[in-house]
Structures are given as structure tokens and as C-alpha cells.
């Protein structure tokens, strides 16, 4: 298969025949270069190098060294007047309207890094000042009182570490990983994000730790929240509701941000990718390969 081909495919045909002769296997197709906005691989993203410009609403994502599933926050970056900045040092944090703590491949190691970098102290100071704090998966675990690892699933030599103490919960790592699709309706949410009550959410969980005092989708209140659900901001109305809260606190109009359906946009982008792939590949041949008929 030839991927991301630019130009007239007819010009490429002689080369495809030569390739088949040299390799002794058929070319399954040619997929043209197409601009499709889909989620990046964690290690291949260009988002981390983007501008640190602060816009009408400013959101800071803490860029921990072992960051994962950072695309949880993509719904926020598709508003023209919202800046989503990835921050890995205190001097770049400033005073954002919301701080997001992402998932991580190692909660304990990245929690230690937060302490050593001074970012934990900066986050605690921001939380004390009323800034909205939201952690997802590993970032959620960091917000609790303790993270324990009695079986040393994550790190050898570490059985327990203090969390930030912003949420009334404790996390314990176990050998079996939680992997599940989840959906539901927000209820019982208190504090700044109480407007989420009644909205539907869906996503997935994939994590090693279990947290006591955990609500189904959203824990916390006041101005600090956390969730194990990846994709929690994608469903219609959720990102909008959070941004409306931030706008009201800042005294600016939500209309200046422009409404955006993240879930619908993502579906349209994947549909576009599927159409391009189907149009470029010999799909009957691909299916025969999948069924081991070739």
C-alpha cells in the first residue's frame, strides 16, 4: 500500500507494477494525501510545539513527561478564542482559567516530577485561588490524598506516595487493568460544574488503579474535579457548559467562542478518512487478506 500520495495516480502506475515485480506481492492500493483532523499518537503529536499565546479563555494542560491520551482535551482547542497550552514549567503557567491534568503512563513517576518541577506547588496555589482544576485518569489520581502501589505494579521500590490532597480519595494500583466502555448521565455534581447535571457523557476507562470515594463519572466539587473517563469532554454540550462557566466567571460572552460539536466533528473526520481509504484500496483484496484467503 502506498500512503499519502500526492499527484496523478496514473503517473505512478508503472512504478506500482515494478514494485509488485520486485516484492512478489500485489499492491493493495494507493491512498492520496488528505487533510484529516483525527487524534494523534501520543508520541507523534505536533500540538506540544504550538504557540503559547493566551486568548479570551486560557486553558493550561500540564505536560507531564509520560503524558498519554492528551487528545481528551481536543474539544477545547477547536474554539477560535480558546487557547489550549501545553505547559511543562512554572514560568509558562501564568494564570489560566482552567488547569487540566492529563493521563499518564506512570502516575507515581509523573507526580514526583510535578513536585520537583515546582508545578505541583503552582497548581495548589491556583486551586486555592479558585482556578478550575480537572484531572483525567492519571491526572485524576494525582489530585487525591494518596497513591499506593503495594504490588509495585508501576514502580519498583515505591509502595505509596502522597497525592496533591485536593480530592478526598485514595488510589491503589492492582495487577489487573480496568478496560471498559462507559456512558451515563451526570448527577450529583456540585460546585462550579454543577451545570453538567443532566447531561449525557460517554467514553472509556483504561487504568490500573482503583480510587475509593469515586463517583461514576465525575468526582470532586468546589473548583477541583477528576474522572477516569477518557473522551468525557466529547459529548455534545459538555465542553460548551464548562466554557460557559469560565466565561461567566471572567465576565465575557460565550458567543465570542462559537459553539462546536466535538463528537459530531470527530465522526465526520473519521468518515472522511474511511471514504478516502475505501476509495484508494482494493477492498475485496483487503478482505481476502483479512480472512486469510490470500
Model-predicted segments: where are they?
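Cysteine-nucleophile active-site neighborhood
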Residues: 104-192, 200-201
Amino acid at each position: 500500500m502506498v500512503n499519502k500520495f500526492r499527484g496523478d495516480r496514473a503517473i505512478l502506475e508503472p512504478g506500482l507494477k515494478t514494485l509488485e515485480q520486485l516484492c512478489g506481492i500485489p499492491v493493495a492500493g494507493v491512498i492520496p494525501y488528505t487533510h484529516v483532523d483525527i487524534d494523534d499518537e501520543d508520541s507523534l503529536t505536533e500540538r506540544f510545539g504550538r504557540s503559547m499565546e493566551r486568548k479570551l479563555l486560557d486553558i493550561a494542560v500540564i505536560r507531564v513527561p509520560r503524558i498519554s491520551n492528551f487528545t481528551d482535551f481536543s474539544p477545547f482547542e477547536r474554539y477560535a478564542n480558546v487557547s489550549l497550552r501545553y505547559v511543562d514549567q512554572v514560568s509558562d503557567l501564568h494564570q489560566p482559567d482552567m488547569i487540566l491534568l492529563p493521563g499518564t503512563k506512570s502516575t507515581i513517576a509523573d507526580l514526583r516530577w510535578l513536585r520537583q518541577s515546582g508545578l505541583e506547588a503552582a497548581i495548589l496555589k491556583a486551586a486555592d485561588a479558585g482556578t478550575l482544576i480537572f484531572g483525567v485518569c492519571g491526572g485524576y489520581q494525582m489530585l487525591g490524598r494518596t497513591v499506593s502501589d503495594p504490588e509495585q505494579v508501576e514502580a519498583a521500590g515505591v509502595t505509596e506516595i502522597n497525592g496533591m490532597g485536593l480530592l478526598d480519595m485514595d488510589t491503589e494500583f492492582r495487577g489487573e487493568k480496568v478496560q471498559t466502555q462507559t456512558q451515563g448521565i451526570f448527577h450529583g455534581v456540585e460546585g462550579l460544574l454543577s451545570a453538567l447535571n443532566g447531561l449525557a457523557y460517554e467514553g472509556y476507562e483504561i487504568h490500573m488503579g482503583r480510587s475509593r470515594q469515586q463517583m461514576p463519572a465525575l468526582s470532586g466539587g468546589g473548583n477541583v474535579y477528576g474522572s477516569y473517563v477518557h473522551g468525557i469532554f466529547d459529548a455534545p454540550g459538555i465542553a460548551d457548559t464548562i466554557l460557559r462557566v469560565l466565561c461567566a466567571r471572567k465576565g465575557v460572552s460565550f458567543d465570542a467562542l462559537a459553539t462546536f460539536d466535538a463528537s459530531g466533528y470527530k465522526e465526520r473526520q473519521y468518515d472522511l478518512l474511511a471514504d478516502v481509504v475505501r476509495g484508494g484500496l482494493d477492498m475485496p483484496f483487503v478482505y481476502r487478506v483479512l480472512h486469510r484467503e490470500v
